[in-house]
């Protein structure tokens, strides 16, 4: 018997796979698992129900399938009890299962340390933030299960972020936009490897893992901004300015921008709103300089660079590579504060900076903090992570930034140094 029997953070896969749950057709527990398929994002058990006779592909409880498990009847080629509100998951799944890709998939296996007992963390996803959040889980498996070798399945563009200590990296040569596909070639690669291990588990790949205990330097090789040096280092603020997720001045402006996107030939007019965002960022910088004349600024993001002159170091680009990623990460790590619109673009900035001011759209209230790599357990969270309305004017953003600098010493002393919290 494994010493991890019943461990809720591990899903037994080989040699004795755990059934994902009851039969979704008849609710019977009398099910038999006849293997597992790894076609891409989903990891699915090949299940036969001894009660109703259904043959199914049923999601193992990893990633988003932990909360939203899907099942496919392999006889009828149809989803089982699919909820319409979850069509963002089941529609791509059944579409690609019905038309699997025959394209070869290049998977590069890099072995750092051989292990006979392993846990596989599948981070494949079609969204940048989803991949990164799944990858954050690696830290917990490395720390909690030192006798299990960690294998990370990762899109090639994320390979630079795989943390030190990982036993194996299976780097998949697919773009994020291709990750929805059903790839027999990828499954064949995994199947060929599985039987070479004595014991295999799946890592849960939680969608929103605890971050405050994670050592981000293990992932990026860059030490994050040390909180105790907040008011000792030169003031530095980094703005994250994407062209595809804008800071709008008004609600009518946002409506017009979206309407232009549907009008084909008029899409070019949307560039005006990108320029408007730059003007708002520069107004924020000027307002910050009124209170903190020595402040320095960096601008990053997927965008065409230019327009900031000597006001800020402009690291924006549309051509991403590992060198650009590292330049951005170093900018975050030198920053007391990062400022940006809600989105996955805030995960690495907040993992390295001391704090942030986030512009939060109304339709993302339910996702608040999901894009923030929260570094602090205590009341410093409230002080260091600030959220403003999506139409907040530049001076409002600037007031939050300058208040973080002017009030840090007093707040930090009263809420962390003068008390018992720092002894935990």
Identify the meaning behind each predicted range.
Residues 1-236, 240:
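Secretory-pathway glycan-assembly enzymes, especially type II membrane glycosyltransferases
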Residues 116-122, 234-265, 300-302:
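Short loop/turn segments at strand-loop or loop-helix junctions that form parts
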Residues 156-158, 301-306, 342-346:
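Short, polar loop motifs at secondary-structure junctions
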Residues 239-245, 262-325:
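Catalytic donor nucleotide-activated moiety binding site of glycosyltransferases and closely related
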Residues 328-371:
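A donor-sugar binding/catalytic signature common to diverse glycosyltransferases
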């Amino acid at each position: 018997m494994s010493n991890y029997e019943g461990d809720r953070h591990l899903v037994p896969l080989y040699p004795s796979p755990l059934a994902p749950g009851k039969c979704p057709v008849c609710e019977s527990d009398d099910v038999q698992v006849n293997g597992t398929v790894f076609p891409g994002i989903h990891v699915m058990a090949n299940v036969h129900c001894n009660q109703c006779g259904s043959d199914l592909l049923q999601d193992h409880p990893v990633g988003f399938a932990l909360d939203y498990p899907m099942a496919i009847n392999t006889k009828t080629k149809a989803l089982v009890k699919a909820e319409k509100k979850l069509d963002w998951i089941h529609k791509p799944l059944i579409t690609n299962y019905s038309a699997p890709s025959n394209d070869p998939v290049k998977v590069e296996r890099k072995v750092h340390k051989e292990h006979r007992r392993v846990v596989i963390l599948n981070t494949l996803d079609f969204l940048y933030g989803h991949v990164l959040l799944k990858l954050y889980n690696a830290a917990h498996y490395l720390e909690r299960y030192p006798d299990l070798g960690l294998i990370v399945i990762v899109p090639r563009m994320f390979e630079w972020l795989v943390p030190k200590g990982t036993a194996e990296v299976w780097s998949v040569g697919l773009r994020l936009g291709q990750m929805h596909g059903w790839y027999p070639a990828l499954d064949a690669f995994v199947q060929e490897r599985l039987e070479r291990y004595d014991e295999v588990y799946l890592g849960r790949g939680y969608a929103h893992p605890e971050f405050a205990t994670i050592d981000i330097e293990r992932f990026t090789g860059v030490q994050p901004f040390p909180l105790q040096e907040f008011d000792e280092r030169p003031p530095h603020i980094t703005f994250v300015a994407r062209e595809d997720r804008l800071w709008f001045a008004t609600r009518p402006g946002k409506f017009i921008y979206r309407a232009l996107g549907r009008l084909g030939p008029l899409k070019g007019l949307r560039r005006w709103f990108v320029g408007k965002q730059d003007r708002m960022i520069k107004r924020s910088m000027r307002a910050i300089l009124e209170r903190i004349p020595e402040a320095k600024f960096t601008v990053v993001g997927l965008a065409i660079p230019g327009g900031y002159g000597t006001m800020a170091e402009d690291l924006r680009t549309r051509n991403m590579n590992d060198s650009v990623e590292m330049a951005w990460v170093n900018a975050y790590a030198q920053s007391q504060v990062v400022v940006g619109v809600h989105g996955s673009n805030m995960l690495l900035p907040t993992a390295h900076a001391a704090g942030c001011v986030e512009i939060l759209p109304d339709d993302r209230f339910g996702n608040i903090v999901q894009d923030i790599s929260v570094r602090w357990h205590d009341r410093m969270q409230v002080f260091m992570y600030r959220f403003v309305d999506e139409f907040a004017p530049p001076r409002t953003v600037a007031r939050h930034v300058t208040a973080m600098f002017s009030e840090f010493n007093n707040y930090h002393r009263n809420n962390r140094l003068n008390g018992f919290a720092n002894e935990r």
